[in-house]
UniProtKB/Swiss-Prot annotation:
Keywords: ATP-binding, Ligase, Magnesium, Metal-binding, NAD, Nucleotide-binding
Pathway info: Cofactor biosynthesis; NAD(+) biosynthesis; NAD(+) from deamido-NAD(+) (ammonia route): step 1/1
The organism's place on the tree of life at top rank: Bacteria
CDD domains, per database record: NAD_synthase (cd00553)
Keyword NAD attributed: yes
Pfam name, any one: NAD_synthase
Enzyme Commission number(s): 6.3.1.5
Assembly description: Homodimer.
Binding residues for deamido-NAD(+): 118
Protein name: NH(3)-dependent NAD(+) synthetase
Natural source organism: Chlorobaculum parvum (strain DSM 263 / NCIMB 8327)
């Protein structure tokens, strides 16, 4: 498999995602959105698409730093705010997170990172209720498939326009949309603690895992065929385990079916398919 197999017609992607955002938001009876703007590439792309879809006045970005957040992240988030002319508010989560861990001083980095992510989502949904806007998601396909995110934290949203785009495809779309190179070229990081890096956490690069995921998902290749492409057995086994183990993160809560029409199984509300006026 060659790297270019992951390449998309990004003009076509843009032409799909812009009306997708507008139509889905309006289906739910909303006109505006709120999203977390971290200074990373994923939220920058979603912000760019939302502004083009709904207009800058209908997009609110929340900057939600913790005390260890890098200055660069805040600068890059502000760069997108200034570029697009969208509305923005800064809501630090330091007080909430530190108060939570006052009685849990031995909590691991993982637990602290999860609480940071959920504290940010708390801010987003509170603003959603305050302003009557819908929360846009910023999790990409690579993160969703690997379970590299916090359930009911950064993975929570009402509409996610980039959930079917691999991380490497997000970089391509970002270049197409004209996102500043400072955001595209920097090392991916959730900025949960000083020096944190996505690829260091995962133990492999996004380019490597996207190639493997593409073969597993889009090409539906079996293990032996994938290994014949030069993928290391241990790498394949680890990634497959992550995909299988984290299936629950990609689902709404499982409901036991007891009636003829069950939410999430065979009950559909009219707005799920009706044409929007």
């Amino acid at each position: 498999m060659e790297p270019q197999d992951l390449h998309l017609d990004y003009g076509l992607v843009e032409s799909i995602l812009i009306p997708f955002i507008r139509n889905e938001i309006r289906k739910f009876g909303f006109r505006s959105v709120v999203l977390g703007l971290s200074g990373g590439i994923d939220s920058a792309v979603v912000c760019e698409l939302a502004a083009r879809s709904l207009g800058a006045d209908n997009v609110l970005a929340l900057l939600m730093p913790y005390k260890t957040s890098s200055r660069e992240s805040l600068e890059h988030a502000q760069l997108m705010v200034d570029r697009l002319g969208i509305r923005a508010e800064t809501m630090p989560v330091t007080g909430v997170v530190d108060a939570f861990f006052e009685t849990r001083p031995d909590a691991s980095r993982l637990r602290r990172g999860n609480v940071m992510a959920r504290s940010r989502m708390l801010c987003l949904y509170d603003v959603s209720a305050r302003d009557g806007c819908l929360v846009l998601g910023t999790s990409n396909k690579t993160e969703l498939m690997l379970g590299y995110g916090t359930m009911f934290g950064d993975m929570a949203s009402a509409v996610n326009p980039i959930g079917d785009l691999y991380k490497t495809q997000l970089w391509g779309l970002a270049r197409h949309l004209g996102v500043p190179s400072e955001l595209i070229d920097k090392q991916p990081s959730a900025d949960l603690w000083e020096g944190q890096s996505d690829e260091a956490d995962l133990g492999f690069s996004y380019e490597e895992v996207d190639q493997l995921l593409y073969m597993m998902l889009e090409e539906r290749m079996e293990r032996d065929a994938i290994l014949a492409e030069g993928i290391a057995p241990a790498f394949y086994d680890r990634v497959r385990q992550m995909v299988v183990r984290n299936q629950y993160k990609r689902m709404m809560p499982v409901i036991a079916k007891l009636s003829s029409r069950t939410p999430g199984i065979d009950f559909r509300y009219a707005r799920d398919w009706q044409e929007m006026k």
